[in-house]
Swiss-Prot record:
Protein name: Eggshell protein
Region (Disordered): 145-173
Keyword terms, alphabetized: Repeat, Signal
Signal peptide residue numbers: 1-18
Keyword Signal carried by entry: yes
Bias kind Gly residues: ranges: 145-162
Species for this entry: Schistosoma mansoni (Blood fluke)
C-alpha cells in the first residue's frame, strides 16, 4: 500500500512539475491561462477563463492583464489591463461590462465583423474604435469624435476606428 501511494505521489509531482515549467498554457474552453506565454485565439484563457502574465492571448470572456494582451485578450466582458491591450483586447471587454485601461486598448476593424471592436462601449482608456457611445464616464474614438456621459449618462458617438486588422490566431500583435 505504501509503495502504491508513493508511486502515485511521485507521478503527481512529475505531472505538476512538467506542467508548471511548460510554456504551453492552452486553457481551452473555460480554462485558466497563467504564465509568460499565454497566446492565441479561441483557447488560451478560453471561454470565461482568466489570463495573467506577460503575453496573454485571450479568449472570449477571459480577463487579461500584463504587458501584452493580444488576440481577443480581454474578450467579451473581460478586463484588459497593461501597456498594450490589442487585437480585440478591450473590445467587448473594455466593452460590454468590462474595463480597458493601459497605454493602448486597441482593436481596429476586421471585415469578418460588422463593427470596429477596440474599446467599444469602453469605460475610459484609449479605445481605437467606436469608443464611448455607452461609456459610464467618458470615451474617445480616435477618428475625430468624442463623447462624455457622467453618472452613467449616454456619451456621444466616437469617431470610426483605425485600419488596424488583427490576426485571429497567434499571440500578441
Amino acid at each position: 500500500m505504501k509503495q502504491s501511494l508513493t508511486l502515485v505521489f511521485l507521478v503527481a509531482i512529475g505531472y505538476a512539475t512538467a506542467h508548471t515549467t511548460s510554456h504551453d498554457y492552452s486553457g481551452g474552453y473555460g480554462g485558466g491561462c497563467y504564465g509568460s506565454d499565454c497566446d492565441s485565439g479561441y483557447g488560451d484563457s478560453g471561454y470565461g477563463g482568466g489570463c495573467t502574465g506577460g503575453d496573454c492571448g485571450g479568449g472570449y470572456g477571459g480577463g487579461c492583464s500584463g504587458g501584452d494582451c493580444g488576440n481577443y485578450g480581454g474578450g467579451y466582458g473581460g478586463d484588459c489591463n497593461g501597456g498594450d491591450c490589442g487585437n480585440y483586447g478591450g473590445g467587448y471587454g473594455g466593452g460590454n461590462g468590462g474595463g480597458c485601461s493601459g497605454g493602448n486598448c486597441g482593436g481596429g476593424f476586421d471585415e469578418a465583423f460588422p463593427a470596429p471592436y477596440g474599446g467599444d462601449y469602453g469605460n475610459g482608456g484609449n479605445g481605437f474604435g467606436k469608443g464611448g457611445s455607452k461609456g459610464n464616464n467618458y470615451g474617445k474614438g480616435y477618428g475625430g469624435g468624442s463623447g462624455k456621459g457622467k453618472g452613467g449618462g449616454k456619451g456621444g458617438k466616437g469617431g470610426k476606428g483605425g485600419t488596424y486588422k488583427p490576426s485571429h490566431y497567434g499571440g500578441g500583435y
